[in-house]
Curated annotation (Swiss-Prot):
GO molecular function: anthranilate phosphoribosyltransferase activity; magnesium ion binding
Gene name tied to this protein: trpD
PANTHER family for the chain: ANTHRANILATE PHOSPHORIBOSYLTRANSFERASE (PTHR43285:SF2)
Organism of provenance: Nocardioides sp. (strain ATCC BAA-499 / JS614)
Reaction catalysed by this enzyme: N-(5-phospho-beta-D-ribosyl)anthranilate + diphosphate = 5-phospho-alpha-D-ribose 1-diphosphate + anthranilate
Upper classification of the organism: Bacteria, Bacillati, Actinomycetota, Actinomycetes, Propionibacteriales
Quaternary structure annotation from Swiss-Prot or TrEMBL: Homodimer.
Residues engaged in binding 5-phospho-alpha-D-ribose 1-diphosphate: 81, 84-85, 89, 91-94, 109-117, 121
Name listed for the protein in its UniProt record: Anthranilate phosphoribosyltransferase
Length: 341
């Protein structure tokens, strides 16, 4: 059994905590037992010290223990970014999820409303006509019927509401900002995760490795929480409990360099229209970014043990075919219809 003075004292002294200690702290927070001051102190002290794989794993373990369960058969894929890059870009991961589903992956996307941008994944999906208030059993059925479903984080991790006030009042990013992509409630087997924070990206990769998940964690060298098309990206490739690091250059895949402004988005209605134009066949910088990120997701889903440069070539080709054949557009149409029933 830990205590708050013990946990906070260790963090203030710069000492690392065990997974058991962070799991205890998260249990206090998510049960409503921790005070606002204790939650804020823990969040800031852990962030200031710098998180370890073991510490974040303890937080993740507790979140999973208290999450609303959802059971979806088959090999599952999630594509999500941490946010926080302040790029105000279009919803690349959401579009990539639809394209990956069009290519045959079974996608269970875990996401939330916007925190630091104008439109989060939940916001744009609502604007596209997808209902978010369905029970877990129906969401699982939709995944099987359509090939994609969406788990709204607030519904599947309801105990996180206890951390909402201190997080909002702090007004700065903390470790909590990185937990959503690590806690897909369907326990997706393959994950393509964008992380804007260069310190946290390898930590997130380590958490996936510890859990035995196949994952690609990446960060654009321009700071984007995606595989970027404006320059190169760093990639942490997770398979078999091991993490390897490499780089991705879109030029190697025949993708032209883009200007940063070409990926800038707007509010949910604007970004939903960008999705529709992409699926209708519009070419350009947005399509290139989506093809690259959907290709990465398909690579980790289909070929997790292959070298990234080889798997990415095949993944990008499948992503292009998903768009060009109309398969991705049909996925969205079926998804909207399925959530309306």
């Amino acid at each position: 059994m830990s205590t708050w003075p013990e946990v906070l004292g260790a963090l203030v002294a710069g000492s690392d905590l065990s997974a058991d200690q962070t799991a205890w702290a998260m249990g206090e927070i998510l049960s409503g037992e921790a005070t606002v001051a204790q939650i804020a102190g823990f969040a800031i002290a852990l962030r200031a010290k710098g998180e370890t794989v073991e510490e974040v794993s303890g937080l993740v373990d507790t979140m999973y223990a208290l999450a609303t369960p959802i059971s979806v058969p088959g090999r599952l894929l999630d594509i999500v970014g941490t946010g926080g890059d302040r790029s105000m870009s279009v919803n690349i991961s959401t579009m990539s999820a639809i394209v990956a589903a069009g290519a045959g992956a079974r996608v269970v996307k875990h996401g939330n409303r916007s925190a630091s941008s104008q439109s989060g994944s939940a916001d744009v999906l609502e604007s596209l006509g997808i209902r978010l208030d369905l029970p877990a059993a129906r969401l699982a059925e939709i995944a099987a019927e359509v090939g994609i479903t969406f788990c709204f984080a607030a519904a599947f991790h309801p105990a996180m509401r206890y951390a909402a006030v201190p997080r909002r009042e702090l007004g700065v990013g903390t470790t909590f900002n990185f937990l959503g992509p690590l806690t897909n409630p369907a326990h997706a087997h393959a994950q393509a995760i964008g992380c804007a924070d260069p310190r946290m990206a390898p930590v997130m990769a380590g958490v996936f490795a510890r859990r035995g998940v196949d994952a690609w964690v990446f960060r654009g060298d321009d700071g984007l929480d995606e595989l970027t098309t404006t320059t190169t990206s760093r990639l942490w490739w997770v398979h078999g409990g091991e993490v390897r690091e490499t780089s991705v250059d879109p030029a190697d895949l025949g993708i032209a360099r883009a200007e940063a402004g070409a990926l800038r988005g707007g509010d949910a209605a604007h970004n939903a229209e960008v999705v529709r134009r992409l699926l209708a066949g519009e070419t350009g910088a947005v399509r290139d970014a989506v093809v690259l990120n959907a290709g990465a997701a398909l690579a980790v889903y289909d070929e997790p043990g292959s070298a990234p440069d080889q798997a990415l070539v095949a993944g990008v080709e499948r992503a292009r075919e998903s768009l060009d054949s109309g398969a991705a557009a049909r996925v969205l149409d079926r998804w909207v219809a399925a959530t309306a029933r």
